[in-house]
């Protein structure tokens, strides 16, 4: 078989290609692959890259080699390599876990081991605690640490907290693995299994393997590389460093990468595999900008020398706050798109913490009409479909009025806004709660003291039909989840059911409420309105929920648990679900976090948040193990992630990669204050730019003067600037007013702006509207005049819109007065007509009781469904009314 030769003419199994950022390592691989496509027709050619870089690599190879030649090369991530091998070896036999199912199993593992734990005994439904455990589990698996290895390490430690932690972690880890059994496959184990089956599969035997764009490898990935070294004819690995000699003794910007290179060489040497002399690429092929080259060469070096010439390609910006920073970024991108031959995909925005910028940066880009792709994880618990499901489960455990109203307002229960308002007004008026939702309502919909007419009876009948339509599917769900519960106390029931029964009950509820149809209608409406991204999200939410129910039924199996516990676990699984984002445009600004982002040859890069402790970030605090404990375990042979000192070094590497990413232009911004108004200082990253490039462009934002057009990059910007300059007597203000006044569609907005800016009194512009609200003739009482002068808006609401404050149907002072007046007006004329001689106080009491009970029956729906407080207050009213009537009779 023909062997590959390195560039020195000798044969090698491991070839390292070294070079700093921009030195052309990836291009070197593409050129090498291009040559091998023509000369090595019999051997597999593989290019292994990080998962998030695979699409870009495939596209680049397609553009460089053409479709026919590019088809000879397999572009794989480690995950895709595992999938490829498992398809041939049968490694997919089992149900694969996702984050939601993993959360369920960890919660159950904690529950199973609770009696053996002392340190890790928190609540098994606490999402943050479970996430911490899963994070620790992920680290252990990626570091190829088994439960047995943890247990052995715990026994080797002296008695103390760390020994207890290691022992308890091994118990939890072991319980988790036991739950996996032979039924489930944890993707976190894929690379471990891949390393085991690779030698037997023979699929990659004799391959020419190129590994590119990794900054380091986990222990699992090193195990896979170890197996590949024994199978492939050559393994070529690129590393972002120009040397393997770590003169900085572990503290340099390339120290983490150098450690990776040395580990690879040691791995090959232990297996007696030859290692070629590294290929070192020294020329920067990315940029010709002197300023950008200086940053790449000298950043984070103690003896870096400043560039004394102008450095206009680099801009250092001091921003007032995060909002000014994002606005500046969006407007600058818009300006560059307008002024230069640039496309959105030529721009990249880098932050250290994407969550900090979510809702601000994307809003600023949308304001400027700039397409972007921001792959973020969003909380789906507030989505209507998820909300109606969780509300239904909680309502089944007890008829909570607030939850029932929330369920109706999701828009998926089939109730119109008018119906929801009617129900809400009624339940608030009559204080309906608990079991009151399951009984026919009898209270007057118009209030406690309103007459009960035929029209009122129709309203009440309509409300009861709405109530039954809401409650009936929930009662079916309740009877499945709590079959032995009484109507009053479901939480006391000892009912247990399987995860399959639980999932089936939830699906039946969604079917009865026709939630799927409502989702389809919403998707169609959003599509018609042009909201295609939101429509796609709603459609995927339904698929996600059904997948979650299937996964829940499978993960819980036949184990019988209380319904409340199953509800907790199902909520956990939904909380861990990731709907993901789908790019809506091929030409979009790329936004990413510095530790995960893979740059696709951006011409311009914006680095945001170059503040102390933000970027570079301080080492993460917390976690289940302290730095000291982590170091002790590493010294005992457990290959855990490095402690915080090494994290600090890695942060500098992330900053270096961001600084060296652009080919033409770099913007670095830092904030002067946070949301609380506290002062923020520039970080080492910003200080490095300032020190190495003393003549770079420096800006402070906001910078616009009132008479300036600066910063106006869109129609929205221009309207906002006009509002700011409304009272300014400048040429810019006049020009903007003239520009928008000439647009008929802007007339209403300008009028509204003028009224607000000039503080003009609110008045009817259309007399017909005033007549419709107040009539042709207005009759004004003294109380109305008093209300008008007290609050004009309150007067308008009360007498124009005829809005009444919602008032509970209870015997308050107003109802008391109405009822007392009714008693007096009903009985006193009778007594006067019949004569007062012989009238006794006992008869007055009897007549008063009869009159009040008649009033309550006719106008308040009777006493049968009234609470004890109502009856008590009614007795007080009877005594008071009777005494008052007797006093008047005596007078």
Task: Give the ranges of each region predicted by the language model.
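Short, Lys/Arg-enriched N-terminal segments with co-localized hydrophobic residues
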Residues: 2-12
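Accessory N-terminal region flanking or inserted into the helicase ATPase core
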Residues: 10-17, 112-213, 220, 224, ...
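Anion-coordinating catalytic cores for phosphoryl-, nucleotidyl-, and glycosidic chemistry
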Residues: 14-72, 77, 94, 225-226, ...
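Conserved P-loop NTPase-based nucleic-acid remodeling module centered on helicase motor cores
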Residues: 42-152, 160, 796, 819
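Extended, charge-rich low-complexity interaction segments
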Residues: 99-119, 265-281, 399-424
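Conserved Walker B
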Residues: 213-215, 354
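Catalytic acidic motif of RecA-like/P-loop NTPases
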Residues: 215-216, 595
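Extended, H/D-rich, highly charged conserved domains that either
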Residues: 216-283
């Amino acid at each position: 078989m023909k062997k590959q030769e390195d560039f020195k003419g000798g044969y090698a199994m491991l070839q390292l290609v070294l070079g700093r950022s921009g030195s052309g390592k990836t291009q070197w691989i593409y050129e090498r692959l291009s040559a091998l496509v023509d000369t090595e027709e019999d051997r597999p050619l593989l290019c292994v890259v990080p998962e998030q870089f695979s699409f870009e690599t495939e596209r680049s190879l397609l553009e460089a080699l053409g479709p026919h030649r590019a088809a000879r090369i397999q572009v794989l991530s480690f995950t895709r390599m595992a999938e490829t091998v498992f398809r041939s070896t049968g490694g997919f036999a089992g149900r694969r876990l996702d984050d939601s199912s993993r959360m369920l199993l960890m919660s159950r593992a904690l529950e199973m081991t609770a009696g053996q734990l002392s340190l890790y005994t928190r609540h098994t439904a606490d999402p943050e605690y479970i996430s911490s455990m899963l994070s620790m589990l992920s680290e252990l698996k990626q570091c190829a640490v088994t439960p047995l290895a943890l247990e052995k390490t715990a026994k080797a430690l002296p008695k103390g907290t760390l020994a207890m932690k290691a022992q308890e972690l091994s118990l939890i880890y072991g319980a988790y693995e036991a739950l996996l059994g032979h039924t489930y496959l944890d993707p976190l184990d894929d690379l471990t299994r891949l390393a085991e089956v690779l030698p037997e599969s023979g699929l990659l035997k004799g391959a020419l393997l190129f590994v590119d764009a990794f900054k380091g490898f986990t222990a699992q990935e090193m195990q896979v590389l170890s197996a590949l070294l024994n199978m492939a004819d050559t393994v070529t690995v690129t590393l972002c460093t120009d040397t393997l000699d770590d003169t900085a003794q572990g503290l340099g910007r390339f120290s983490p990468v150098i450690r990776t290179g040395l580990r690879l060489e040691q791995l090959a040497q232990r297996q007696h595999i030859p290692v070629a002399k590294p290929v070192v690429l020294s020329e920067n092929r990315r940029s010709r900008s002197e300023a950008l080259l200086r940053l790449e060469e000298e950043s984070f070096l103690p003896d870096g020398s400043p560039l004394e010439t102008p450095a206009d390609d680099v801009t250092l910006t001091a921003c007032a706050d995060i909002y000014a920073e994002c606005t500046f970024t969006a407007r600058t991108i818009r300006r560059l798109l307008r002024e230069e031959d640039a496309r959105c995909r030529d721009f990249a925005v880098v932050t250290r913490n994407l969550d900090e910028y979510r809702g601000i940066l994307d809003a600023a880009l949308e304001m400027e009409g700039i397409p972007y792709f921001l792959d973020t994880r969003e909380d789906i618990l507030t989505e209507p479909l998820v909300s109606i499901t969780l509300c239904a489960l909680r309502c089944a455990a007890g008829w909570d009025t607030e939850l029932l109203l929330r369920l109706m307002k999701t828009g998926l229960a089939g109730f119109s806004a008018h119906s929801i308002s009617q129900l809400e007004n009624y339940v608030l008026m009559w204080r309906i709660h608990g079991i009151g939702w399951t009984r026919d309502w009898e209270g007057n919909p118009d209030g406690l003291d309103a007459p009960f007419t035929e029209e009122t009876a129709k309203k009440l009948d309509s409300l009861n039909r709405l109530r039954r339509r809401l409650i009936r599917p929930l009662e079916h769900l309740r009877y499945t989840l709590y079959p032995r519960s009484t109507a009053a106390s479901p939480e006391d029931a000892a009912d247990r059911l399987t995860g399959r029964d639980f999932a089936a009950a939830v699906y039946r509820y969604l079917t009865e409420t026709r939630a799927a149809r409502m989702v389809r209608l919403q998707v169609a409406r959003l599509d018609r309105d042009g909201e295609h991204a939101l429509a796609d999200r709603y459609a995927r939410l339904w698929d996600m929920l059904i997948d979650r129910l299937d996964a829940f039924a499978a993960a819980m199996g036949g184990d019988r648990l209380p319904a409340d516990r199953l509800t907790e676990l199902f909520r956990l699984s939904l909380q861990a679900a990731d709907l993901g984002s789908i790019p809506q445009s091929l030409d979009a600004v790329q936004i990413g976090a510095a530790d995960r982002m893979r740059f696709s040859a951006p011409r311009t890069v914006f680095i945001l948040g170059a503040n102390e402790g933000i970027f570079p970030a301080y080492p993460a605090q917390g976690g289940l193990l302290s730095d000291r404990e982590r170091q002790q375990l590493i010294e005992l042979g457990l290959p855990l992630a490095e402690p915080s000192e090494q994290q600090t070094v890695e942060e500098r590497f992330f900053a270096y990669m961001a600084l060296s990413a652009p080919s033409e232009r770099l913007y670095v911004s830092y904030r002067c204050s946070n949301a609380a108004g506290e002062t923020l200082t520039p970080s080492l990253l910003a200080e490095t730019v300032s020190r190495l490039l003393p003549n770079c462009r420096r800006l402070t934002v906001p910078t616009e003067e009132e008479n300036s057009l600066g910063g106006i990059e869109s129609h929205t910007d221009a309207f906002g600037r006009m509002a700011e300059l409304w009272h300014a007597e400048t040429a810019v203000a006049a020009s903007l007013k003239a520009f928008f006044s000439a647009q008929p569609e802007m007339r209403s907005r300008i009028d509204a702006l003028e009224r607000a800016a000039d503080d003009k009194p609110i008045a009817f512009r259309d007399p017909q509207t005033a007549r419709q609200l107040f009539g042709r003739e207005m009759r004004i009482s003294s109380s109305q005049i008093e209300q008008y002068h007290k609050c004009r808006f309150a007067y308008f609401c009360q007498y124009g819109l005829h809005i009444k404050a919602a008032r509970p149907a209870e015997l308050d002072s107003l109802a008391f007065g109405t009822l007392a007046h009714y008693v007096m007006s009903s009985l006193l004329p009778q007594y006067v007509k019949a004569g007062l001689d012989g009238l006794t106080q006992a008869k007055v009491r009897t007549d008063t009781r009869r009159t009040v009970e008649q009033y309550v029956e006719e106008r308040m729906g009777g006493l049968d469904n009234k609470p004890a407080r109502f009856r008590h207050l009614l007795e007080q009213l009877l005594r008071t009314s009777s005494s008052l009537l007797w006093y008047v009779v005596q007078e």
